[in-house]
């Protein structure tokens, strides 16, 4: 079975595929020997020969009784006079009845062309006759309605035509109408709806006896006929009978190309190659009417159009899609100038409507533009730019991929890329059809084929994916990512979705227009196809590749910076969590009976394969638990999963998971047997069992062999408890305020429970420090420490109240109200400042390209907590009122430093924040703190989410 690389359709025979390919490539193998026009089908060529009156053997084709040949797809019908009198017409030209009565024989347009003209608002002989009958058009104006002189004369006849043209013969500048739609403007060939639009102030004509028989009327044809001294009856130029839709375009020009692709200076407009010769040059001279009203496939200027592209910092991508200036240059002067007004990026416009990180007043969701269709059309426009995609090379920094724990990305084969392209074509067309709806068939031409980025670019994006995603959610086994192996499995559609989402994740951290359009479009495309795949086959809900793809989509869309994608990711997060829960993968599974490592290579391979299958079920489950925990933390919600649900065994160490062969895996297992008393092949405990041991303070037992992922997952129950008790504390009046002397028993007990959870957090931190004394720090461990400090920060702050204060919702303007609000927002200032400093220190210690996707959100939380604390004056009565002691950089010292311990225990010392140049800033000025945190965000990799967080801090500084 063979596949079409353009649409993905399958064929059983090669000749069927070869015939089908012609519908995509615009290749027309059948050529006319007379005018050298090409056709896609043989029957079209046979019909075309009737225009010349000679067949392919140069033999004359006899006309049937002098009838007019069927040219341009038109069947001869009765003339207008015979049709009105309902008299039989011999369909000659002129017919015998009109000739005998000395009447003017006029060919009557067909029913289809009349309807098309009426739909476009064109003037036809029937509409003129109707207007005369109704009295709306005097009879003496019919001639003017049938033929209107052009205001600009064709090239080569300027002096002659200037006498008969309209007084306003100077070229006028006509600009495109801008729309307020949030979606990107449709391609130029779509905006014309397949038909030319009459220019303003010009009444177009419909071909009649004095015109030409073609599909549409073009300005300048009638003047051209007058100047060359030919009447319609004498004119025998067969070029006016050509089917303009079958016009052979020069090599390199595709009528489906976007306008920005016409800027290729290598494009050759050879008039002779199109079978027009030099006779068409005066007609195709550039004038405002012709340029403004013809779709790009029919524009054949004397000189290649030159485009001046501009970009905007506000719109990193749409500048290449919207903000373009088209300057068409003719032989004499610039006849027309187009300048589209800059349109803001809808993703940037919708940032004020985020449902999270709301430190500034937000707008109503109905006022935010939808970006789903915009992302898809931006992706389609980018992938259709074949020349640009083949030449595009992202800025590759090889230093970003250095490291021993980096996954290897295997080279992508051409067959893999072709199969992925075929399936992607179907995914994209399905998504466009859904979002365009009925409008697609009316205002959009059939989508041209798209091309994926070059293989080297795809491999770079996959390497970026392994560098940013796999470090925190390790799901790829054997130490290498092989897209070829994924594509040729039993479920190629699920594998294609997984690879496309990997590419989108890798392109997320590349700050270029092409990469951002690739990320936004692929996320929406894969979201629709992923949901459709699960809906068609519910068994796929437990498939490893489907769970992996859904995890990447949820994580990618949640931190994309696109409001629409962030909202729908949070909504579908619950759906995927329920799907994961109901599939049964959370239940306890045990390893099958296994032999010893000394039973031979065959048994070792068998044990290794069984072990990989078990890990492949465990790792997606706990990766989902980690993603759910992160989203719940930053959205101020409770996690969807409870600890008691996780009965499946925890994952093993990363060294075992990334073993490249059974021998390497066996060797690593043997080392574990020699260092521990437990069985290395035994199943690890589940998260439920591990949490029980942690609460019982039994983590020092020899049976518990911890790794960074285990420590990371232990934070899940602690975060859930902190969130639960903080929610209860918010229900009491002025929780933590000293002015309330007689608190209720429930409030006091809740505060005690919260303090117990803080003790458990300290126990977790001690275990983590003991682990780091024996092992080197890794990305998962760094992220776990940041989450620990953020959870501890939640225990001493009310972040929802802090954001309300930033929006001026809980502040009446008095200092007393500000002090009360501050006490409600921050219950322990010293603990809050300590954890904020540690978060900044950990984020800065991470490489800028190897950071969790939520790192900017953590800096945002730190900025608002420190800003809130800077609003009030510190006095001597406060526990942390700046007592005697030296100043210290709270974000530059480890947690066990004596200065930090003295500050936490006795309140001595003045904490400050350090800068890259070694200087420090105080914490008593809110604008300085916000600006410092904004500079920290600028130090990281650029993304839409990072830019959105940076913009919110800027707006808060201006309020």
From Swiss-Prot:
Stored Pfam families: Fungal_trans (PF04082), Zn_clus (PF00172)
Phenotypic effect of disruption: Blocks the expression of the elsinochrome cluster genes RDT1, PKS1, PRF1 and HP1, and impairs the production of elsinochrome.
GO molecular function: DNA binding; DNA-binding transcription factor activity, RNA polymerase II-specific; zinc ion binding
Principal location class: nucleus
GO CC annotations, alphabetized: nucleus
Origin superkingdom: Eukaryota
Location in the cell: Nucleus
Disordered: annotated segments: 154-226
Induction details: Expression is induced by the presence of the cluster-specific polyketide synthase PKS1. Expression is up-regulated during nitrogen starvation or at alkaline pH, but repressedin the presence of large amounts of glucose.
Stored InterPro entries: Transcription_factor_dom_fun (IPR007219), Zn2-C6_fun-type_DNA-bd_sf (IPR036864), Zn2Cys6_DnaBD (IPR001138), Znf_C2H2_sf (IPR036236), Znf_C2H2_type (IPR013087)
Record's compositionally biased regions (Low complexity): 163-178
Keywords: DNA-binding, Metal-binding, Nucleus, Repeat, Transcription, Transcription regulation, Zinc, Zinc-finger
Alphabetical GO biological process terms: DNA-templated transcription
Protein name (Swiss-Prot/TrEMBL): Transcription factor 1
Gene behind the chain: TSF1
């Amino acid at each position: 079975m063979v596949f079409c690389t353009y649409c993905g359709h399958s064929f059983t025979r090669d000749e069927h595929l070869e015939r089908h390919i012609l519908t995509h490539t615009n290749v027309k193998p059948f050529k006319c020997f007379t005018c050298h026009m090409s056709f896609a089908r043989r029957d079209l060529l046979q019909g075309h020969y009737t225009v010349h009156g000679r067949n392919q053997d140069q033999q004359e084709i006899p006309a049937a009784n002098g009838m007019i040949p069927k040219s341009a797809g038109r069947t001869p019908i009765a003339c207008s006079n015979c049709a009105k009198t309902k008299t039989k017409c011999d369909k000659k030209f002129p017919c015998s009845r009109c000739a005998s009565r000395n009447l003017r024989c006029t060919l009557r347009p067909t029913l289809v062309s009349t309807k098309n003209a009426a739909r476009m608002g064109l003037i036809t002989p029937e509409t003129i006759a109707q207007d005369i009958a109704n009295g709306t058009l005097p009879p003496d104006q019919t001639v003017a309605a049938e033929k209107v002189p052009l205001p600009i004369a064709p090239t080569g006849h300027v002096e002659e035509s200037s006498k008969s043209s309209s007084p306003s013969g100077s070229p006028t500048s006509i600009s495109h109408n801008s729309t307020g739609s949030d979606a990107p403007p449709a391609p130029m060939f779509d905006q014309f709806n397949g038909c030319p639009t009459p220019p303003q102030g010009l009444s177009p004509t419909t071909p009649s006896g004095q015109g030409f028989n073609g599909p549409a009327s073009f300005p300048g044809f009638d003047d051209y006929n007058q100047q060359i001294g030919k009447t319609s009856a004498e004119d025998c130029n067969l070029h006016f009978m050509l089917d303009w839709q079958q016009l052979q375009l020069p090599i390199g020009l595709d009528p489906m190309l976007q306008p920005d692709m016409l800027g290729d200076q290598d494009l050759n407009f050879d008039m002779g190659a199109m079978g027009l010769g030099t006779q068409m040059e005066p007609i195709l001279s550039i004038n405002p009417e012709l340029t403004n009203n013809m779709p790009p496939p029919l524009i054949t200027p004397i000189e290649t159009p030159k485009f001046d592209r501009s970009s905007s910092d506000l719109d990193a991508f749409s500048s290449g899609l919207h903000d373009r200036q088209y300057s068409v240059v003719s032989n004499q002067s610039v006849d027309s100038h187009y300048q589209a007004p800059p349109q803001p990026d809808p993703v940037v416009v919708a940032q004020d409507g985020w449902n999270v990180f709301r430190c500034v007043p937000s707008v109503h969701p109905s006022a935010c533009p939808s970006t789903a269709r915009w992302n898809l059309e931006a992706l389609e426009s980018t992938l259709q730019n074949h020349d640009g995609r083949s030449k595009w090379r992202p800025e590759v920094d090889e230093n970003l991929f250095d490291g021993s724990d980096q996954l290897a990305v295997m080279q992508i084969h051409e067959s893999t890329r072709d199969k992925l392209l075929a399936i992607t074509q179907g995914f994209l067309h399905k998504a466009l059809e859904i979002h365009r709806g009925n409008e697609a068939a009316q205002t959009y031409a059939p989508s041209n084929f798209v091309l994926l980025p070059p293989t080297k670019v795809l491999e770079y994006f996959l390497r970026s994916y392994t560098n940013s995603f796999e470090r925190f959610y390790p799901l790829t086994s054997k130490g290498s990512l092989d897209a070829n192996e994924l594509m040729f499995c039993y479920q190629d559609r699920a594998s294609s979705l997984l690879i496309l989402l990997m590419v989108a994740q890798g392109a997320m951290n590349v700050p270029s227009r092409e990469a951002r359009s690739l990320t936004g479009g692929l996320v929406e495309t894969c979201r629709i196809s992923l949901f459709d795949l699960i809906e068609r086959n519910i068994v796929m809900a437990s498939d490893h590749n489907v769970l992996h793809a859904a995890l990447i989509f949820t994580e990618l869309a949640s931190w994309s910076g696109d409001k629409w994608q962030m909202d729908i990711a949070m909504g579908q997060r619950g759906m995927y969590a329920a799907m994961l829960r109901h599939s049964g993968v959370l239940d306890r599974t045990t390893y099958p009976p296994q032999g010893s490592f000394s039973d031979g290579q065959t048994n070792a391979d068998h044990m290794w394969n069984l072990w990989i299958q078990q890990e492949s079920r465990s790792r997606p489950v706990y990766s989902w638990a980690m993603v759910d925990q992160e989203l719940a933390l930053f959205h101020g919600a409770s996690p969807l999963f409870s600890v008691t649900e996780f009965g499946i065994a925890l994952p093993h160490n990363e060294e075992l998971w990334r073993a490249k062969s059974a021998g390497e895996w066996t060797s690593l297992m043997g080392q574990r047997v020699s260092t521990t008393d437990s069985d290395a092949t035994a199943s690890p405990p589940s998260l439920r069992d591990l949490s029980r041991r942690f609460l019982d303070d039994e983590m020092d037992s020899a049976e518990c062999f911890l790794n960074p992922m285990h420590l990371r997952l232990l934070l899940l129950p602690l975060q859930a408890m902190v969130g639960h008790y903080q929610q209860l504390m918010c229900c009491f009046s002025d929780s933590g305020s000293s002015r309330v002397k007689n608190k209720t028993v429930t409030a006091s007990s809740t505060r005690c429970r919260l303090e117990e959870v803080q003790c458990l957090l300290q126990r977790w931190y001690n275990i983590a420090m003991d682990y780091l004394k024996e092992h080197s720090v890794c990305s998962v461990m760094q992220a776990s420490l940041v989450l620990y400090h953020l959870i501890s920060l939640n225990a001493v702050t009310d972040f929802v109240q802090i954001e309300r204060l930033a929006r001026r919702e809980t502040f009446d303007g008095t200092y007393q109200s500000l002090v009360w609000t501050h006490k409600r927002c921050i219950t322990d200032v010293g603990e809050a400042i300590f954890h904020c400093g540690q978060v900044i220190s950990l984020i800065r210690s991470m490489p800028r390209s190897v950071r969790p996707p939520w790192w900017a959100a953590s800096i945002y939380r730190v900025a608002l907590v420190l800003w809130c604390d800077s609003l009030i004056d510190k006095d001597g009565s406060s526990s942390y009122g700046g007592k005697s002691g030296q100043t210290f950089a709270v974000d530059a010292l480890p947690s066990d430093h004596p200065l930090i311990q003295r500050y936490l225990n006795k309140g001595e010392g003045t904490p400050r924040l350090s800068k890259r140049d070694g200087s420090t800033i105080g914490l008593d000025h809110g604008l300085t703190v916000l600006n410092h945190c904004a500079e920290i965000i600028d130090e990281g990799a650029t993304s839409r989410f990072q830019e959105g967080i940076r913009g919110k801090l800027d707006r808060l500084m201006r309020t």
